[in-house]
Each structure stands twice: as C-alpha cells, then as structure tokens.
C-alpha cells in the first residue's frame, strides 16, 4: 500500500499542512535535569467534560491499555478523579516545556468541542497564546460510541474535516473488545469508515485498540493503511509493536509505559525506532507514575518521555527533540 514503509522521521510527509506553526520558545521542562527542552503532547482530551472532573471514576483501564488497574480512569466513558482548570493546565504545560498539543475527539460532540477549543486557544489574548502553547484538533468516533448512529456521526465528522484546517487527523477510532460498549460489527464499520475519511482528506489516522489486535490490523490492511497512521497509547508488547511497525504505523507511548506492570510496553519502546514514535498523555486519563490515579494533564509528557528515553538508551533531550519533530511532521504542523 502507498506509503506503508514511510517513517515519520524519514523525509517530508505528503499532504496539506493544516493550521499554523508555533513560534513559541520552549520553557523549562519539569523533568529531572531541568534542561531547556521542548515537548509535543500528541494526544490529549482538554475539551468540555474531560476537564470538569464531574462524575464517578470508572476504574479498571483506559482506552487501549492492558496494563492498568484500579485508580486509572477508563477513558471517554469515565471521568477523571478531579478536574483541572484549563488556564492552570496550560500554564503548567508551558512551564514543563510542552508547547504543542493535539486535542482529540471521540464522537461528534467532543470532536466539534475540540475544534471550538483549539480555535479559542488560538485567539488573541487567550491563555494558550499567553503561555506560548499551540494546539490542533482531531475528529473521530471512538469504538465505545460506534453504535450511536455511525452514518450520521461520520457525516458530521466529514463536514468538520472539510470546513476547518485546524483539524490534523481522523480519530481516535478503532476497536475495543475489552468493554464491548458497542457491537463488534458496528465498531468495525465505524473504524473502516474513518480509515476511508483519512484517505479521502489525506490526513493522519489515530488508532485505538484494546484486546483487538488481529481485527484492528485486518481492518487497516483491508481498507489500506493511511500513509500517516499512529497506534495511540500503545500497550502491546514487542510482537504487537513489530506487527504495527511492519504495516508502516507509528507508535505513541503514554503514561502506561511508566507503570510497574507494563514491562512488555517498555520492551516495545526499546525496540521501536526513535523516528517511528510519539509521546502523549491521553489526558485526563492514565497519569504517569508518580501521579498515577490523579487527573492527568499535558505537563506530564516529560515523565513519559523520560522513561521512553531510558528504554531507548538515550538522553531525554534527544528523545524530546526527536519526538517533537516526529509529531510536527506526522500531523503536518
């Protein structure tokens, strides 16, 4: 398939550049060492109810994760154990050197909310502008919500993709056989439709998978793997990593890589070529150690990056520089 062997760091990514590049100067990282480095949170949820902290903690596991337990929220169907005000989130992100982020949609409402949030963050006088943080949006239908009118939702997403250049990817989308909140045929239908949207608009694809590796990769093969495809919140082991990499996908590592029971994820991080990886928080879910169980936020990307750097056997400054360049190229920003 076209571009299947293309790596994020191996030359220009084809497709239209969407949005504007940030001119912000990197702040100091909050990570040990405190060197001036710049980080890119490639996957977070900062819109609407995600930051409110309303509702009960669902417990048990975040999207895509096989290495979670009590105290970690379950993703789009659960609320964080405490909300953080957006202005404070942005200030802490900037202080930690996180100057770019992608706000991810999971259904029609949160996708439109991501666009609205990013547009407001880019407006003159916004907290993000004041802090030097730049942001982009994605639109997608999470497998948990795949039974809620796939055709109508895909239509809304398609309109948003056509109308707004702040949207840099389709997703998150994929298959979740752990919770099975939607029938599996509906999940596969929604996933295939969004792969088609990524091809139609020449955009990146953000993939969610949990306990569904075979079917996820089968859908990608049958629909054609978009040239820029990332398996977000990667929670597989070396075998799953190799299968994804062989398809031309990029792996994005989250706070799961810091968990004591995620040795297989660290093995995957060790073998993944550094130009084929991104780092993310999946905020407000999956806070890294030592904050596990609390509401997560982009400022904690350096904690994820520090562990991935250790797995790679490189210093965190190189990991930060490389993954930031990877993310900018991957999303075309």
Where are these regions (language model features)?
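Mid-domain alpha/beta scaffold segments of enzyme catalytic cores
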Residues: 1-333
């Amino acid at each position: 398939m076209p571009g299947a062997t293309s790596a994020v760091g191996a030359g220009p990514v084809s497709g239209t550049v969407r949005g504007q590049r940030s001119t912000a100067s990197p702040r100091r990282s909050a990570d040990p060492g405190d060197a001036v480095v710049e980080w890119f949170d490639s996957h977070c949820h900062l819109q609407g109810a995600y930051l409110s902290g309303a509702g009960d903690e669902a417990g048990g596991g975040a999207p895509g994760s096989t290495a979670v337990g009590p105290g970690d929220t379950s993703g789009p169907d659960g609320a964080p154990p405490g909300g953080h005000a957006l202005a404070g989130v942005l200030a802490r992100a900037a202080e930690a050197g996180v100057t770019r982020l992608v706000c991810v949609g999971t259904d029609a409402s949160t996708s439109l909310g991501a666009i609205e949030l990013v547009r407001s963050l880019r407006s003159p006088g916004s907290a993000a502008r004041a802090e030097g943080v730049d942001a982009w949006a994605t639109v997608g239908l999470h497998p948990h919500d795949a039974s809620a009118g796939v055709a109508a939702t895909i239509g809304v997403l398609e309109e948003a993709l056509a109308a707004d250049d702040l949207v840099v990817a389709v997703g998150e989308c994929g298959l979740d056989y752990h919770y099975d909140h939607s029938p599996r045929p509906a999940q596969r239908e929604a996933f295939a439709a969004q792969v088609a949207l990524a091809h139609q608009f020449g955009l990146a694809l953000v993939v969610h998978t949990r306990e569904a590796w075979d079917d996820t990769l089968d859908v990608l093969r049958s629909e054609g793997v978009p040239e820029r495809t990332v398996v977000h919140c990667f929670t597989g082991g070396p075998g799953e990593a190799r299968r994804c990499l062989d398809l031309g996908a990029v792996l994005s590592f989250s706070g799961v890589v810091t968990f004591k029971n995620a040795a297989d994820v660290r093995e995957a991080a060790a073998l993944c070529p550094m130009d084929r990886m991104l780092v993310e928080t999946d905020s407000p879910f999956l806070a890294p150690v030592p904050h596990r169980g609390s509401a997560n936020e982009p400022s904690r990307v350096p904690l994820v990056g520090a562990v991935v750097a250790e797995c790679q056997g490189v210093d965190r400054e190189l990991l930060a520089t490389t993954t930031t360049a990877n993310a900018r190229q991957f999303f075309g920003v």
